[in-house]
Amino acid sequence: MACVVSWNCRSLRSKVCRIKDLIYEVHRVCIALQETYLKPADIAKLKRCSLVRKDNENESGRASGGVALLVSHDTPSSVITLHTNLQAVAVRVMFSNLVTVCTLYFPPSTSVDERDLNRLVDELPTPFIILGDFNGHSPLWGSKNTNLRGRQIEEFVNTHSLCLLNNGEDTYFHQRSRTFLNQVRFAPGIIWSLSFRSRVTPKWMSVI
């Protein structure tokens, strides 16, 4: 079965070898990356894949955050143009049906306007999957507690009748801080007709 991988890679360029391994593994149709740490002038190419990215720089001009989608050239796809200030990109990908895949990153220190989230959903053709690192805590996706960002995401999920695709496990353990980072993915209820399964690999990559 074709699958989608979501990974907070914390620098695309430093993880190129691992990303290439993912690309050449069987059935990796689409790879959603967060915290790519790329600047607009940075060149990033991978053979037999299209790369759709949104770079981000902090106030000092250093690469910070950023998202990207890698899609196999063997899979029909088209880029969705998003008009959002959020760190997000989206691609329409052919599985057994056409599905919009969106990757999204929320920096921990940045507030997220609910209106921006609502506008993002309005721009995504259905059915869609949103994958990302939202830096939010909630028992709904494996955290032991709930923070303000987590409650905001919970409300967002309820407002748009989205289905969480997490399996309830903690999704990323940060060795230095000894804390779990949160990879969350969700989709409208209609997506279940496509028979997606969700799991977390030992490498803390979310696989759908």
Regions found by a protein language model. Name each.
Residues M1-I208:
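A shared catalytic/ligand-binding motif for oxyanion handling
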